[in-house]
Amino acid sequence: MENKLKIIFLDRNTVGPFELKDIFSKYGEYTEFNLTNDDDVASYLKDYDVVILNRIKLGKKEFEQAKHLKLVLLTGTGFNHIDLVAAKEHGVSIANVAGYSTNSVSQLTMTFLLNELTKVEKLSQKVKENKWNELSINMDNYYHVDTEDKILGILGYGNIGQKVAEYAESFGMKVMVAKIPGRKYTDNSDNRYDLDEVLEKCDIFSIHAPLTDLTKDLINLDRMKKMKKSAIILNLGRGPIINEDDLYYALKNNIIASAATDVMTTEPPKNDCKLLELDNFTVTPHLAWKSQKSLERLFAAIENNLNLFLENKLIGVESK
């Protein structure tokens, strides 16, 4: 390669123990930082042609100072942390990766769903507290709920939403796909239902939508009040799709039964996050996407995006 690139990975620790130097050093000079403070991002970018990142935010200030930057390679699907307008103004292409973690995210969704219905986590904890006999005699609060004939509402019907629907139907569940209010659908949306109707009828509501102006705070207290008291909310989309103050109120006051999420509005959540105090709230640290198979597919796709860029064939999220 005649013109060697200068490539930097700003938050390499977010993808785990996966060897990357051999992949990217053949394109030029490769540098990686385990994590980067937000205040340091702009200064690191100024000398590099390509930046790889997962959760680092890039705004107007960062693009203004990144005089040599040509390409941002995202190690994921979401891009709400990137100022696409500023990127375009400064001639920087943005490339994300879709579909690499469909199976792993769908698996965690079903893990959440089954855990909420069978109470495995809570039962295990009770046994560890030496309450086996108590549970065997009095199961009033810990009986299993069958999946058969339960209704799963899905918000966001891309690769992951469709895979979750497939899994759910194999467990005997009925699936209702919700429309995002205000969104125009170009595909056949006859099999989609109004959001409020889905919320009223579903037993479990699973979120797999991206964060946009239309989905931010979409699931608020007014909408949760439309749901059954026995309803369960799962969020494997983006944290701000649910208003977390409203979710806390709904869980605390038994407006809905429980919630499980892999994403939060602030990640990691602050120490005083009230949701973390609740027994009917389950959270994992935004790791639904991270399986070994997913990582292999992810970095193969990222390298492919880099090659497409070098061949002037990149489409990406935004392209010059």
Which residues fall in each region the model found?
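N-terminal glycine-/charge-rich "phosphate-binding" loop or analogous flexible N-terminal tail
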Residues: 1-48, 176
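Hydrophobic/small residue at the entry helix of a nucleotide-binding pocket
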Residues: 160
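Rossmann-like adenosine-cofactor binding region
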Residues: 59-63, 181-274
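Phosphate-binding beta-alpha-beta segment of Rossmann-like dinucleotide-binding domains, i.e.
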Residues: 90, 98-151
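Short beta->alpha connector loops at strand-helix junctions that form conserved
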Residues: 34, 75-76, 92-103, 179, ...
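Rossmann-like dinucleotide-binding domain for NAD(H)/NADP(H)
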Residues: 94, 230-320
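Conserved N-terminal Rossmann-fold NAD(P)-binding element of oxidoreductases
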Residues: 10, 154-155
